[in-house]
């Protein structure tokens, strides 16, 4: 399961409706970034193995540590940040070849360590690209999200996605065909 963005009850209903499975059947979870929108279901997936690209784990840890330092006097904020840090430390770093015909595809920019998954087949290349290509509108306009950590890096990653994939699974939309390749 990649970027489990729905609340657990809703995702469980979707999994059951579409594939006849429930959250307990999920064995692996991959996040394209540590963005809170990408991890809403994690509380229902404690039994699964969690993976995230190492640069994303490192950059998220630095960001949380920085916020902890600045929130030194606010115990409530420190407690919340501590929970985020505990959650982050539960992630493992995947191999570059996560599964057969599934490779990591780093797409830094939206966050410093954003990473997609490249699904290789004989006829098409599918890229789960997270928020590097957020929606159909972003793809059509050739733009990235305005809240990127580094817009220049995000745009470079966006261009790499366009060059390599036939089909995109964007971060906030349904599956999209690459207009240059279709």
Predicted regions and their residues:
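Pre-active-site segment of Zn-dependent metallo-hydrolases
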Residues: 1-28
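Active-site flanking residues adjacent to catalytic metal/cofactor-binding acidic residues
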Residues: 2, 32, 52-53, 128-131, ...
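Short, flexible loop segments at the rims of nucleotide/cofactor-binding pockets, characterized by
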Residues: 5-7, 28-29, 104-107, 144-149
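Metallo-beta-lactamase
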Residues: 21, 26-37, 52-106, 112-181
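Short, conserved loop/helix-junction motifs that constitute active-site signature segments
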Residues: 24, 42-46
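Conserved acidic residues
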Residues: 27, 48, 166
